[in-house]
């Protein structure tokens, strides 16, 4: 019960922070950053993905996707905190949240959701990791190396698109 209450408190902080950000972008970004980091910590602590990481096959793939997504969620929170303190990092925050966290969640849940919704049978194999690896490698290239070299940022962005196409195939 305490876990659920804490989770609800974090969600309320996140929704409140999002509302404040919409009203006062420059001032209230840290009200969004802190709940993002808290959510990443909560998920990383209580999600079953920590245990299924040591399984085999599809459960392990899903755990890798989820845990990588939680790491990007923490990065997004840290980046938004930096933005609140006046550091440049909006691009990092948006891409860590949008591509790193959200797309990782989509990739991790798709093998269960798509067959249920579309009535398609997906055969899991090691190739499932290719789009995931491409996504995270290209995102690192885009937001870490790309800070110092704009050409590499552009290449990272193009490789992000390739990763999404690989996933769609």
Name the predicted role of every residue range.
Residues 1-18, 32-34:
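Long hydrophobic alpha-helical segments that form multi-pass transmembrane helix bundles
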Residues 16-23, 27-42:
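A conserved active-site cap/scaffold subdomain adjacent to cofactor or substrate pockets
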Residues 32-38, 97-99, 152-169:
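Small-residue-rich transmembrane alpha-helices that serve as helix-helix interface/gating elements
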Residues 12-15, 29, 36, 59, ...:
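Small-residue packing motifs within transmembrane alpha-helices
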Residues 1-7, 22-26, 42-64, 77-94, ...:
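Juxtamembrane membrane-water interface segments of multi-pass membrane proteins
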Residues 11-18, 66-74, 99-102, 128-142:
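Hydrophobic membrane-spanning alpha-helices of multi-pass integral membrane proteins
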């Amino acid at each position: 019960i305490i876990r659920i209450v804490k989770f609800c408190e974090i969600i309320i902080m996140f929704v409140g922070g999002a509302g404040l950000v919409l009203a006062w972008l420059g001032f209230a970004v840290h009200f969004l950053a802190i709940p993002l980091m808290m959510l990443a910590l909560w998920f990383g602590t209580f999600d079953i993905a920590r245990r299924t990481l040591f399984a085999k096959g599809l459960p392990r793939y899903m755990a890798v996707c989820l845990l990588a997504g939680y790491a990007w969620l923490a990065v997004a929170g840290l980046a938004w905190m930096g933005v609140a303190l006046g550091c440049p990092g909006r691009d990092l925050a948006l891409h860590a949240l949008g591509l790193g966290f959200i797309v990782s969640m989509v990739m991790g849940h798709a093998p269960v959701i798509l067959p249920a919704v579309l009535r398609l049978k997906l055969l899991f194999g090691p190739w499932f990791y290719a789009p995931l690896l491409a996504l995270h490698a290209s995102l690192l290239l885009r937001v870490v190396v790309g800070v110092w070299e704009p050409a590499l940022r552009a290449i990272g962005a193009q490789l992000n698109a390739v990763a999404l196409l690989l996933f769609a195939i």
